[in-house]
């Protein structure tokens, strides 16, 4: 019986146990255990693809998920990491079929070929099983399934656990896979709860007089998920799932929904929540804070993060008339993936952000009289731009029309527009403008051809996963032009000068993982000039996007920092904005990502410094005692005999390997025997930038929220020279001077 080890997942999982998660039952004599997922990493030889399965087994229920039960022990495969949107595969090493049956526990989505476990022999699927759920409601209960494999005895086989679905029940749960000569007996399923997500509460309805900008209500980090709907008159205004506390003692934080346009009217609010919780709902001009806003213990201080709830992908990024507009995938009413509203913030400099009313709302369904911001279903990712030439004909006054392109999961690729500088948004009545199997459109104006371009993830038999290119003259009618194979989710495409020469430009294309290709684009077709993809970004980085219509020609990128921030009224955050450039290197033209210069305005004066400092066996370190947690550290090291140079900041570290020429896991070549890197340290996270932007890593801190204490540079295995070390303390972007 082979129980093999597992790969580390940095704190993205909620560690919850239950009566069903009792110690694993020992396999019956003669059984062959293939995997029980009890270790800290996936079993040896199991291959992970995509993002849905993370890097290690789940420990029960994940953030934003209904209660998971029926698995054995403490671990299981659970692809709800980040919600139903992420996809991926988990493939076992090859094994020999030696018993009559393969038995396993399975639950989650019931989409054939999409959320399933397959048995492959000679590369072909011979048996498959799915979870039981395809419709809203359902249960996250795992039950036994048996495959009769007697006719395959002696053959080599592979197991493949698949999550290739992104809508409702777009995930799969699997546990305790064994070979046996006996079939496992199904367990009685738990009684269905009266509310979604194990919520036993009835629906409660009440009327609330709208006297302020918001309806505010309490949330619990381990609450009972229930549906809330808000009508004003006959109009559907909000319809979302909320993590309600079971009682007053379980309140962790308060959130809000925008209601300013209805002041003076009465809203009918229906919620599946405890009566004592429903009584706390109120209209208010103020959001209730149980911790100081933007100064919570783990709040990033110079990285954008939303006031309340979960965030994932950056969306809609554009500039108009002196303001940067930043949007994002947002769950206003919980710390896990759900609901997919679009948050919205504005900034004059991409550093100091002010949150605005949320721009888009999900789950309008087929209700004709719904709020103008509401989509049919989820508002998945997309982009933004400014219709400077009024090609769509929506402009009403002197202000240009701002346009959002996004995926409405109940409709297709859709548009919303604003004629008042982003204050209000209208869902285009002609949606969808593109109907296909993909999502996450990037909207771009192609000036040489005087037409719009949408680059969007697609998937078909001919091209597999790809970026599809569409064009339009008026934003409303679109033609498909070409496909770029080998990309998944959140497409981005833009033009950059090489070595800052405006007469020598190339185009860059990438998708959610930020691995990019360089080539040529004629407005309809992208042609790469090399095989494969290149890489700048590493670590907990995903789904980045660049600002459209920039005022100074820069291409500035922001990514989703996939960092779990525990026990806060918000979860996840974003990277610092980075300026993208193309440079000629000894390996060819490569893209660099450098933090924008505007961040340097947050540096406090009088940095701690060291120059031309020799580190030897007798004096192997230079060390500074520091206060606070916010730092910008810039290092230049000169090679000596040391194997490594290590920068430590609190419990975290960045290591340069002189022999391997790597900065942590990132390849980074020295120049003239020297290497330069920079670390931006914030309360829950840090970013490591090597070689002036040749590589860029995003990571959570090991000691989130704790004072750094000391910053040190150490030579390991010999000597080196600290050519320069500068440690700047940083100011908070939330605190106005």
Explain the meaning of each model-derived region:
Residues 127-139, 188, 195-197, 236-254, ...:
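Surface loop/turn signatures of beta-propeller and other carbohydrate-active proteins
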Residues 85-87, 95-103, 154-157, 208-216, ...:
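Extended extracellular/luminal ectodomain segments enriched in beta-structured repeat modules
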Residues 121-169, 200, 218, 223, ...:
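Extracellular carbohydrate recognition and processing domains
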Residues 165-181, 275-282, 719-721:
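Extracellular carbohydrate recognition
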Residues 74-103, 112-113, 142-146, 198-209, ...:
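Short beta-strands within extracellular/lumenal beta-sheet-rich domains
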Residues 104-105, 159-161, 217, 269-270, ...:
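Hydrophobic core segments of beta-strands in well-ordered, beta-rich domains
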Residues 202-218, 224-234, 261-273, 290, ...:
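Beta-rich accessory regions
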Residues 27-56, 183-193, 295, 597, ...:
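Extracellular carbohydrate-recognition regions
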